[in-house]
A protein has these predicted regions:
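Hydrophobic alpha/beta core scaffold segments
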Residues: 3, 8-319
Length: 319
């Protein structure tokens, strides 16, 4: 099907649970097509884990072709991994042109199969596919939603890490798990299971970007889906009033845009699991669709401008 669709038109694709105009679906195919009022260039970065910078020549050429204006262009991407390398690569090309980045990591691959993305009807491992989209009749805005808040003003510093494993070994010179357990009162053997309630956050200026724990070593090292660098400022977070946060996000979007023609969103699998557990996800999907035509995907990680994040919703709103 993918090959037949792509005979005439460039297209990109990913795998995952889909949200389409208020409906949630784990199977089948959702297709979004642009027919007018946009300029689009699609591309692929192969060998993403080894040398993503090799794709910048083509990316810069395509940026020049669409001539981005002020707040009217976005780069939407889907990747199989190597997120930090890819975000750095995209930022080097997009930031000076005022182009926002919104993307997601593949999630939902069958057991034993490698993650893949699709480009022009072909499947690729270790890759990132993207679409540069310029709105010729209105603005494009990108939003990041965080439903977690700092548990306290207490911050910690990553004093020992292994970036190759996305492992946080020590905070403030102590095993990371010991610091987490002492501050939150969570037994060490319950830390990873507690990720939906109390993830960690990396502070960058006034913003906090979530890093989700996915494992713990016997020495108290915490492995994560988002890389933590040495000397990063880390906070422990707690789940806030997510329904109120969702409402505030929708109100802000409606306030910013006079007319919404499309909403594209990327949600984290952990948000999906939390909302499913709370019996809220179907309501959430309908609420997103109340903004206008909506297509969402649930991924294993999210990319927002110059950051790779976890447990976050990123959405692109077209006027």
């Amino acid at each position: 099907v993918g090959s037949e669709m792509c005979i005439r038109d460039r297209c990109i694709g990913t795998i995952g649970t889909k949200l389409v105009n208020g409906q949630v679906n784990d199977s089948g195919l959702a297709v979004l097509g642009f027919f007018s009022d946009v300029k689009i260039r699609c591309g692929i970065i192969t060998e993403a884990s080894r040398c993503p910078v090799a794709g910048t020549t083509q990316l810069l050429k395509q940026i020049a072709e669409i001539s981005p204006g002020t707040d009217d262009t976005v780069c939407v991407e889907y990747c199989t991994g190597s997120e930090e390398k890819l975000v750095t690569t995209f930022t080097s090309c997009l930031e000076t042109k005022g182009i926002h980045l919104a993307g997601g990591t593949v999630f939902g691959v069958p057991d034993g199969k490698p993650p893949v993305v699709a480009y022009n009807g072909e499947l690729y491992e270790d890759a990132c596919v993207y679409a540069l989209i310029k709105n010729t009749t209105g603005k494009i805005r990108v939003y990041k939603e965080n439903i977690y808040e700092k548990t306290s003003a207490q911050s910690h510093f990553a004093t020992k890490v292994d970036v190759s494993r996305k492992a946080l070994i020590e905070l403030d010179g102590r095993p990371a798990a010991d610091v987490y357990s002492a501050e939150l009162g969570i037994p060490r053997d319950k830390i990873v299971d507690n990720v939906l309630v109390n993830p960690m956050g990396r502070a960058v200026g006034n913003q906090v970007f979530i890093s989700s724990m996915n494992g713990m070593d016997t020495d108290g090292t915490l492995t994560n889906y988002k890389r933590i660098n040495k000397n990063d400022c880390i906070y422990f977070l707690s789940l806030g009033d997510y329904k109120a946060t969702e409402q505030q996000t929708r109100q802000q979007i409606q306030q910013d845009a006079s007319h919404i023609s499309l909403v594209l969103s990327i949600d984290c699998i952990y948000r999906y699991l939390l909302y499913e557990k709370e019996g809220y996800f179907s309501t959430y999907a309908k609420d997103m669709a109340s903004l206008g035509p909506h297509l969402g995907i649930v991924g294993g990680g999210e990319q927002y401008n110059n950051q790779h994040v976890n447990q976050t919703m990123v959405c692109v709103v077209f006027e």
